[in-house]
C-alpha cells in the first residue's frame, strides 16, 4: 500500500524481505489500482508504509484490522501524529509499541525528487496487534 515509486519496497527487497507492494495509482513499481482502505482480506505479515498524512489514522486503523495478533503495522508519519483527540482513542488501545524519532529532520522526496530542507519532524510508529503495554520511545 502506498508503494509510490517503490523506494521503500526496493530497499526491503534488496535486504531480503518478502514484499507485496500495492498503491492506488501505479507509479512504475508494485501493483496499482488497489485502494488499501477498501481491503478486507487478512494479511499474514507486517504492513509498512508512508501513508498520505490526511488519511494516516484511517490507514493505521485499517492495517490493524487486516493483520493477525503478533504482527506489526509500521508507519512513517509526522511526529505530530501523537497529538489530537481523535487519534487518542487509537493510542488508548495500547497497541502502539514503539516510536522511533529521527534525531535529524528528514527530507522527503516527492516523486523521487528531494527539494529543499524540512521543517517537519518525522518518526517511525510501530504498532503490534495484541500488544498491551506502554509504548517505548527511541531516537534514530
Describe the role of every protein-language-model region.
Residues 1-140:
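Class I S-adenosyl-L-methionine-dependent methyltransferase catalytic core
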